[in-house]
Amino acid sequence: MFEREEQPDLCRSAKAGLIEYRTVQLLHREGIAPSILDFAVENHRCEFRTPDESVVLEYAALTGGRPHYIYPQHQLVRRLCETLTNAGGHIRFGHTVHAVRQDHGGVVLSMDGPGGDRTEIECDVAVGCEGSSSPVARAMTGIRVSEQTLPVRWLVFLGAAPPLVNHTIYAAHPRGSAQQLRRGPDKTRYYLEIPITDTTADWPEQRVRQELAARLGAGGRLDDVPLVEFGLLDMRVRVTEPMQQDRLFLAGDAAHLITPAGGKGMNLAIQDAVELAHGLIEHFGPKHEDQRLLAYSQTRLPHIWRAQAFSNWLLHLITSLQDGREPADAAPGAGR
């Protein structure tokens, strides 16, 4: 495994943090969750707020006791890295792959190491899991990329304090949406919808506090909460079809990009990885069977399109994109 970031940076960058019930069940079936993961913090409900009313959706109760689990992505990545290396696996941190080519029945990766030394690695297959700029994706020909940029921008930041309530809040407001997402007992992720042309410079901390409190209906409860790690998030969606070509494969953000609405991205990536791992094991293991590996794209794409449609529907519901109607084109290819 080659990772472009150094391990300390990779394992402290706070990103996603909501893991679906079915993803946890999948990790349990794979024998991963019991040994390294403690899914003790659960999220059973979400709340939709407007200036006039509030509706709490008890989705766990409505689905037979199936909650989400709060597990910050950087902590999950750190535990998975530790487990892999403890089992004898190798991760080369600080290695940037800049070119990929298929050659003589294999794959050649050209990369730069931590010291800037360029080297080439030959392998049987290559799996690109490195995001939208994936060199593995660039090396694939004849693929179709469906993508869309939505006119929505979120200001993203962390609050170094417990959440207002112990569940997710989606607030729809005439000036834009706001969201509260739990990230642990003393950290909370906030999203604040801002004009598409604004930057962080347009939003000093006092303005952020006032607007967040107004949209969430928080009164003065956020006045003394330290706010850190500010950033911008534009809403882009993308799906690559197929997710494989010969000895090249894509998983996670290298294959598809989804809006943060609904917390689907990390879950899709985990589900991709498990399905692809099974295909590779059956191909290279004692079975020497190719059926599952060849069907990887066909297996995963329906789930990806369905998640895209849901995420974009939710985005339209809570943001300024909402116009009172369910969007007919909530996601590229949503009618599939």
Where are these regions (language model features)?
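Generic enzyme active-site microenvironment
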Residues: 1-2, 128, 171, 251
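Glycine-rich FAD pyrophosphate-binding loop
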Residues: 1-15
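Active-site-adjacent segment of FAD-dependent monooxygenases/related oxidoreductases
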Residues: 11-87, 98-101, 308-311
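Conserved FAD-binding catalytic core of PHBH/FMO-like flavoproteins
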Residues: 82, 99, 104-108, 112-119, ...
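General small-molecule cofactor/ligand-binding pocket signal
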Residues: 90-92
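FAD-binding beta-loop-beta segment adjacent to the flavin cofactor pocket
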Residues: 234-256
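A conserved FAD-binding loop/helix module that cradles the flavin
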Residues: 260-272
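C-terminal helical "tail/cap" subdomain of flavin- and related membrane-associated enzymes
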Residues: 263, 278-336
